[in-house]
Every structure is written in structure tokens, then in C-alpha cells.
């Protein structure tokens, strides 16, 4: 297993809503980093069995929601037990669902921790691509300042940079 630290959450809005097809959804917003990667966290009851075409339409609509000037990755989630969440991510740029999204998973757990719905300690998040465990550590003021993902990883490609003029 590997453990990585994500950027700190910034620009949090926990009590937002978004409307699509005449339905109002709870919709938290968080960016990881400053400026950061934008995520909308949207609870969906029965997410595992939710109609795939309907979820895709909703993801496309919320991804471009006017309250998100950068657009947003849309992280649909359902709490399925104590410190256990199921999540699906509609990813901006890909413009479809992906098997997993580490920053999205961290964003969902940040939101749920701050709302008091999970402990923030070793929260299990199941996704199509597998399972991650998230730790959202809070400072004395209650702000999430350290966000960690733990899970397996696989090498999917290797490369070599050969341009000696490349400056990093």
C-alpha cells in the first residue's frame, strides 16, 4: 500500500445547492490547493443502483454549473456505513466517469468530516476502480490541514526524459 498527501482544502462551501432538471441537490464545493482543483460533492441516495444514463446527464450538467467558474469535477457519493462511502466521479477534461479520482475522494471525505458525517480517520471509500482509505486531519480551529490517501497502486507506464535542455 502507498500513502500520499494531497493539497490542503481551500475555498470550501459546505451548504450549497445546485439545480438540474427541476430537482435541487445538496452540493458542497471544495478546491484542493490555492488555486486548486475544483470539486462538487453531491450526495445521491441509492448511488450504486442509480440509472447510469441519468447519472451521466446529471454529471454533465453539474460539471458546468454556473456557481463553478472553473467548472468542477462532480463527485457523487453515498454513505453506506460508519466511515464507509461509495463514490463515483464525473471528471472535467475527461467529460465522463472515471474509475477513481484521488483528489475527488479527498474532497468528499473533507466535506463529510467537516459536516460530522464521518470521523476523518481511515475512512473507506469504494469506487469502480477500487478502494482508498482517507485520513482528514484537523487543526485546533477545526480546519482540515492534512489530507492523506492510502491504497494500492500499479505501474501503468514508464518513460524517460532525454532532453538535456529541459528545466524542471
Briefly describe each language-model feature range.
Residues 1-100, 109-168:
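Active-site proximal loop and beta-alpha junction motif in alpha/beta enzyme cores
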Residues 103-104:
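An anionic, turn-rich surface loop/hairpin at beta-sheet edges
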Amino acid at each position: 500500500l502507498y500513502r500520499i498527501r494531497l493539497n490542503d482544502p481551500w475555498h470550501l462551501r459546505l451548504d450549497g445547492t445546485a439545480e438540474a432538471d427541476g430537482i435541487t441537490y445538496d452540493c458542497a464545493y471544495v478546491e484542493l490547493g490555492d488555486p486548486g482543483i475544483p470539486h462538487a460533492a453531491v450526495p445521491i441516495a441509492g448511488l450504486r443502483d442509480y440509472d447510469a444514463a441519468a447519472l451521466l446527464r446529471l454529471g454533465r450538467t453539474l460539471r458546468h454549473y454556473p456557481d463553478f467558474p472553473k467548472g468542477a469535477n462532480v463527485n457523487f457519493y453515498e454513505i453506506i456505513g460508519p466511515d464507509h462511502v461509495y463514490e463515483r466521479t464525473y471528471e472535467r477534461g475527461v467529460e465522463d466517469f472515471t474509475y477513481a479520482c484521488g483528489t475527488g475522494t479527498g474532497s468528499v471525505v473533507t466535506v463529510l468530516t467537516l459536516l460530522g458525517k464521518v470521523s476523518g480517520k481511515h475512512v473507506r471509500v469504494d469506487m469502480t476502480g477500487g478502494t482508498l482509505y482517507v485520513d482528514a486531519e484537523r487543526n485546533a480551529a477545526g480546519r482540515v490541514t492534512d489530507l492523506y490517501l492510502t491504497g494500492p497502486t500499479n505501474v501503468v507506464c514508464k518513460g524517460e526524459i532525454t532532453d538535456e535542455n529541459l528545466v524542471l
